[in-house]
Amino acid sequence: SLIDQTDKDFIWMIVDDGSDDGTRDTVQGWIAENRIRITYHTKENGGKHTAYNLAVDNCATDYMFVALDSDDFMPRDAVSEINGLLRSNPGCCGIVGLAVCDNGRKPDDIEKFNMRSMYDVLSTYDFSAETGLVIRTEYLKKFKYPVIEGEKFFTEAYTYYQMTEPFIWTNKVFRTSTYCSDGLTKNIYRLYAANPKSFYMYQKMRSEITVNFKKKLKSVISADAFYIMSGQSEKKSALARLFMPLGFLYYKYIMHKNRT
């Protein structure tokens, strides 16, 4: 789908996160064809967030967009739409477009959030739309993911919650997935158990910056659970200490779900 883009003004950056299936030879063949610009980077497997950090460090364009998995594709006019919006809004922090599943499901309306920040939308609403993001590279470099030894997952929301600059929000589709599942939801308790430190960092951060009291309270309780799970010893806030009993119950629930 990248070769078929109507606007070829982009670079396809491939981050090979430890594959052993001949990916290098395949990519070198694509580069030799010279149909679109491609850069290729390799690293040891460390989780998607570490591959994203490497991509940000090596991005040679003013804006970085749209992260694609191997089973995703972009509509033929996606790059043209993105570049048109960037030309019409010079200096903008970024664009939030839609990512949809190729199953006919009607996508969400996100244009109503136009010129609001990621933090504003995520901390105020029960936002669940899948998105394709275009973000200014220099801005992205402020929000790289922490790397925790022994853990290979860090929720993308950790960086989005910290982005307080206004974004352009559009209902244009930037990414489509041909294989859609709720695998992340199904395996969420395994992720919790395997990555407690990263989830603790995320929920603690969210509890500190979220204004919405309901969301703040949920994050405090979640942070308490991951505090226990990850063996943290740092001093806790008065609010976190107050809700530790509920955090303990949530911790027990997570461990129970992880065993079933």
Task: Report each predicted region and the residues it spans.
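A conserved acidic beta->alpha catalytic loop
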Residues: 1, 16-25, 46
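Short, acidic, metal-binding catalytic loop of nucleotide-sugar glycosyltransferases
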Residues: 1-9
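Short beta-strand/loop segment that forms part of the nucleotide-sugar
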Residues: 10-18, 39-43, 68
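Glycine-rich, basic loop-to-helix element that forms the pyrophosphate-binding segment
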Residues: 43-59
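Short beta-strand-to-loop acidic/aromatic patch adjacent to the donor-nucleotide binding site
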Residues: 62-73
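Conserved donor NDP-sugar-binding/catalytic core segment of glycosyltransferases
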Residues: 77-109
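Conserved nucleotide-sugar donor-binding catalytic segment
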Residues: 108-189
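Catalytic core of nucleotide-sugar-dependent glycosyltransferases
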Residues: 161, 173-179, 187-214
